[in-house]
Amino acid sequence: MPQLDTSTWLITILSMILTLLIVFQLKISKFNYPLNPTMKNINKDLYTNPWETKWTKIYLPLSLPQQS
């Protein structure tokens, strides 16, 4: 059985890693970042849900009466 030649594996793996790094750098460099990021003012009091103001009862399926 012939021996597996692994002499080119190092070059192949290193060139693949280098190519991936270059591709990722190019993708990141094309991304548009905002110039002046500002904080959004979030008011939680403006959005009230009906279940926050009143008590609701949750029925489990097994606690309901049997239907035949």
Curated annotation (Swiss-Prot):
UniProt modified residues of type N6-succinyllysine: K54
Main location: mitochondrion
Modified residues (N6-acetyllysine): K54, K57
Listed GO MF terms: proton transmembrane transporter activity
InterPro entries: ATP8_mammal, ATP8_metazoa
Lineage: Eukaryota, Metazoa, Chordata, Craniata, Vertebrata
Compartments where found: Mitochondrion membrane
Keywords: Acetylation, ATP synthesis, CF(0), Hydrogen ion transport, Ion transport, Membrane, Mitochondrion, Transmembrane, Transmembrane helix, Transport
Role this protein plays: Subunit 8, of the mitochondrial membrane ATP synthase complex (F(1)F(0) ATP synthase or Complex V) that produces ATP from ADP in the presence of a proton gradient across the membrane which is generated by electron transport complexes of the respiratory chain. ATP synthase complex consist of a soluble F(1) head domain - the catalytic core - and a membrane F(1) domain - the membrane proton channel. These two domains are linked by a central stalk rotating inside the F(1) region and a stationary peripheral stalk.
Domain of life per record: Eukaryota
Similarity section: Belongs to the ATPase protein 8 family.
Transmembrane segments: 8-24
Subunit structure: Component of the ATP synthase complex composed at least of ATP5F1A/subunit alpha, ATP5F1B/subunit beta, ATP5MC1/subunit c (homooctomer), MT-ATP6/subunit a, MT-ATP8/subunit 8, ATP5ME/subunit e, ATP5MF/subunit f, ATP5MG/subunit g, ATP5MK/subunit k, ATP5MJ/subunit j, ATP5F1C/subunit gamma, ATP5F1D/subunit delta, ATP5F1E/subunit epsilon, ATP5PF/subunit F6, ATP5PB/subunit b, ATP5PD/subunit d, ATP5PO/subunit OSCP.
Protein name: ATP synthase F(0) complex subunit 8
A GO cellular component entry from the record: mitochondrial membrane
GO biological process: proton motive force-driven ATP synthesis
Pfam families associated with the record: ATP-synt_8 (PF00895)
Cysteine-cysteine disulfides: none
Membrane topology: Single-pass membrane protein
